[in-house]
Amino acid sequence: MSFVALIPARMASTRLPDKPLADIAGKPMVVRVAERAARSGATGVYIATDDARVAQAAAAHGHAALLTRADHPTGTDRLAEAVEQLGLADDTVVVNVQGDEPLIDPALVDAVAATLQASPDAAIATCACPLADAEALFNPNVVKVVCGAGGRALYFSRAPIPWARDALAGGTRVLAPGLPALHHIGLYAYRAGFLRRFPALPQGALEHYEALEQLRALEHGHAIVVHRTPQPPMAGVDTPADLERVRALYADGL
């Protein structure tokens, strides 16, 4: 299995300024992410950033970095530029490892790459796990995905889907037994050729209203295949509290 891991990293975080360079046990967070990605089967790991400080920090710790434009509207656009800089062949599998995931499981990176490689008719592979409880079902920050035959994604939503009419009658908030909904995990694999084309696809109404970029692919008829994992991954870093939690885990010898 051959694939490349790309790590988009931007400095402009409102809740945690300079997040990619936040120290975790003596190394910048983005370097910790690269270390985890390097433990997967990736043949190359590259940090794609719009800031020279991130590139310098990566190089200081022996990791490759690509300087990209600062005006990319999404991380996927940044990856598309990175694919061009690297000159990757269109059939190269590229895994997008988020730059704020210093606890990412290398085995999950391998799994999403293998899922795409086993699905030649799919444009994207991603991951999902069972919903934890009714609170997760109704939480708009927990993205739900429903799948059809062969694990193909039918829809992603912040809303509780599918709507269990009988179980939720009268305003009851429960997770109906056997509800065929999963908690989406934001780890993606693409083919380099699709990444090159993706930024040119116009945003549709579904992506606009849900604010979920992957819906653009579905709206334009591109298949997304979902790898199911039994457990949710360890949470990433969005806030100062998240950062302290991760620091404590590394201090304990993670």
From Swiss-Prot:
Transmembrane feature ranges: none
EC number: 2.7.7.38
CDD domains named in the record: CMP-KDO-Synthetase
Protein location: Cytoplasm
Keywords: Cytoplasm, Lipopolysaccharide biosynthesis, Nucleotidyltransferase, Transferase
Catalytic activity entry: 3-deoxy-alpha-D-manno-oct-2-ulosonate + CTP = CMP-3-deoxy-beta-D-manno-octulosonate + diphosphate
GO cellular component terms attached to this protein's record: cytosol
Entry GO MF terms: 3-deoxy-manno-octulosonate cytidylyltransferase activity
Xref: InterPro entries: Cytidylyl_trans (IPR003329), KdsB (IPR004528), Nucleotide-diphossugar_trans (IPR029044)
Top-level taxon of the source organism: Bacteria
GO biological process, any: lipopolysaccharide biosynthetic process
Residue ranges of coiled coil: none
Involved pathway(s): Nucleotide-sugar biosynthesis; CMP-3-deoxy-D-manno-octulosonate biosynthesis; CMP-3-deoxy-D-manno-octulosonate from 3-deoxy-D-manno-octulosonate and CTP: step 1/1; Bacterial outer membrane biogenesis; lipopolysaccharide biosynthesis
Role played: Activates KDO (a required 8-carbon sugar) for incorporation into bacterial lipopolysaccharide in Gram-negative bacteria.
Family: Belongs to the KdsB family.
The protein's name: 3-deoxy-manno-octulosonate cytidylyltransferase
